[in-house]
Each structure stands twice: as C-alpha cells, then as structure tokens.
Amino acid sequence: IYLDVITNFRYNQSVTNLTRDAIQTKIVGEVNSYFAVNSGKFNDTIRKSKLTSKIDASDPSILGSDIDIKMSARFTPLQNPTTGNFVRTDYTINFINNIQSPLMQVPSISSDRFVVNGISCSIRNAPLHSTTLQAIDIQGNVVISNIGNYEPTTGKVNLVGFLIDSISSGNTYL
C-alpha cells in the first residue's frame, strides 16, 4: 500500500527571496519529515490538518496549502513467459483498509492508464453509488461496463477476467 500525497500551495512572492521551486523543496522536506515520524508503525493515524499546519509553517511566505492523500496499491498483471503477452485472469487487490464508499458522481476507485483492444483506458467505479468497476477511455466513455467490483468495508478490489494489451506508463505494474 502506498500513499500518494498531492500538495498545492499559495505563497506571497514579496516576502521571500526564495523561488517557487525552493519553497516546493522545503514543502517536500516537511512532508517527508512528517511521514517519517508519523507513519510506518501499526495503527498509525495520518492527520491532514497537522501536516497542513507543518507545511504552512515551513516558510513565512506560504499563505496556505491544500493536501489530497490517496491510498494506492500496485499489482503486476500476469504475462505469458513465452510470448510476453498479458494473460486473462482474476485479481484481488487488498488495501487492508476501508475504501471510500461509492459516491454519486466522483469515482472512489481509479487506476493508471493501460491499453485494452487498442484503446487507452483506466479503471473507475461506475457512477451512482456503484461498486461495479468499469474500464473507461480518456474521454470518460465506458469501454468495458463490468470488469469487477470493490468492497468498501473490506478494502478488496476484485478484477474479473482482466486482460490488457499494455501498460501506458511503461511500468510493469498498475
């Protein structure tokens, strides 16, 4: 399980000699420091408000910051060792935590891009409070209407008969 931390900040250029990149480097240092102290042990709790306060206090020019923290899990799709082609199979990805219950319009589940039948796709849960997973193209059109489901209370993501052509990022995992 990985935590993806996306931080946006606002700062006042007139009260600092630092460049935006230099302030960003300070912020990355604060984020790394926070996670070094507050994570890695059983039952650790990450407090966004405390992390935001540390970021805001890291330089007097920072006016405020916004943080988005997402859990991510990686899995490596199975390949035929002889041909190198991906193989159709089922996958269960266990987040070991609850996953956000499905919302009306905003997906609770998303993935990196991959190619299916020559179309660049990603995974999302279907709209309207659904736990059904779909493959969608870049414009949000449904390419495959049901590739599995997720269980919010157990943190399990189930992909059924999942088969891709390639992984768009060039990584070996999704």
Please give the residue ranges for each predicted region.
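Acidic, low-complexity glycine/serine/threonine-rich segments
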Residues: 1-92
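Extracellular/lumenal ectodomain signal focusing on beta-strand-rich modules
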Residues: 6, 64-66, 118, 154, ...
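Surface-exposed interaction regions enriched in Ser/Thr/Asp/Glu
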Residues: 129, 138-174
